[in-house]
Every structure is written in C-alpha cells, then in structure tokens.
Amino acid sequence: MALITTGRGMIRDLEKSGSLAVYPPLEGGFEGRYQRRLRASGYVSESITARGLGDLAMYLTGVHGVRPPHLGKKTVGNGPAVGYVYYVPPIVNYKLEHLPPKAKGLVLWIMEGQILSSQEIEYLTVLPKSEPRVKVIVEMGGDRFFRWTPLQNTLVPA
C-alpha cells in the first residue's frame, strides 16, 4: 500500500454503489484513516458494531423497544417480571435530521460485518437506494492490505 493515499478511489466507489464491503488489515489503523478522509470530503461518519443489533431494519430506521438487563430489578404490578421497555429512536433517521447543512450525507460504518446474514447484507445494499444521503460501509473481514468491493458483490446467489 502506498505511503500517501488520498482515499478518493474508495469515496468515488462509495458514491457510485452506495455501499461497500471493506477488508482492512487485522493490525488496525486503516479504518480510522479512511474515516478521517470521509469526514474531510464532507460526510458524517457513524461507527457501530454488528454484534447485538437484532432486527437491523428496525434498529436503523424504525422506533424500537429496548429492554436493558434487569440486574435483579423487576416491574411492579401484574405484568411479567422482566423489566421495563424503553423506546429508542432510529439511528439513521435521527442522524439524518441532525446533519450539518453542508454535509454530503451520513456514512454508516459497521464493524464485524462478517457475522451478518445474507438477508441483512441485502438490506444494507438496498438502504442507500431508499435514502440517497445514507452510505454504508461494512467490514467483512481482514486482508493483508486495505481493499474494498461493492457490498452487492459479497452476496452469494442462493
């Protein structure tokens, strides 16, 4: 890999396809450099991990209920003793509403994406088509150098 990389190729491919699968080196460091280049080109970056997301569509674009660990505390009354449900706003819609006026859009950077199912990856490829200001980057594993491919190419035909 070159010592000085502008990241223009990745940004151009991201704008063209809407979603990318990236394979950064396992020793780390490259993700932060490319996120910094995305922010310098006008995007707002949001990093999340794929572990524990649950229903991806509801977590990203719908109001969803969250029940935190009860730690011995139970609800009072006649309901089930499993704790209260707190409702959380959707991450993507909330971030889009609060984008700076000059921002190009929102880049959703998802770490540990190799655990996502093919249905969830397919949803992530459709998300930028339904909301053009959202771009998706999913880390799909490691490689010896930083490389990327359109996320659509990682889907295996059934």
Curated annotation (Swiss-Prot):
Q: Which cysteines are joined by disulfide bonds?
A: none
GO cellular component terms, semicolon-separated: plasma membrane-derived thylakoid membrane
**How does the protein's chain sit in the membrane according to the entry?**
Peripheral membrane protein
Reaction equation(s) it catalyzes? a plastoquinone + NADH + (n+1) H(+)(in) = a plastoquinol + NAD(+) + n H(+)(out); a plastoquinone + NADPH + (n+1) H(+)(in) = a plastoquinol + NADP(+) + n H(+)(out)
The record ties this protein, via InterPro entries, to: NAD(P)H-quinone_OxRdtase_su_N
Q: Which Pfam families match?
A: NdhN
Top EC group: translocase
Q: What Enzyme Commission number(s) apply to this enzyme?
A: 7.1.1.-
Q: Where in the cell is it found?
A: Cellular thylakoid membrane
> What's an example of a GO molecular-function annotation for this chain?
oxidoreductase activity, acting on NAD(P)H, quinone or similar compound as acceptor
What's in the keyword line of the UniProt record?
A: Membrane, NAD, NADP, Plastoquinone, Quinone, Thylakoid, Translocase, Transport
Q: What does this protein do?
A: NDH-1 shuttles electrons from an unknown electron donor, via FMN and iron-sulfur (Fe-S) centers, to quinones in the respiratory and/or the photosynthetic chain. The immediate electron acceptor for the enzyme in this species is believed to be plastoquinone. Couples the redox reaction to proton translocation, and thus conserves the redox energy in a proton gradient. Cyanobacterial NDH-1 also plays a role in inorganic carbon-concentration.
The entry describes its oligomerization and partners as: NDH-1 can be composed of about 15 different subunits; different subcomplexes with different compositions have been identified which probably have different functions.
- Record-linked PANTHER family: NAD(P)H-QUINONE OXIDOREDUCTASE SUBUNIT N, CHLOROPLASTIC
The family assignment reads: Belongs to the complex I NdhN subunit family.
**Name by which UniProt lists this protein:** NAD(P)H-quinone oxidoreductase subunit N
This protein's gene is called ndhN
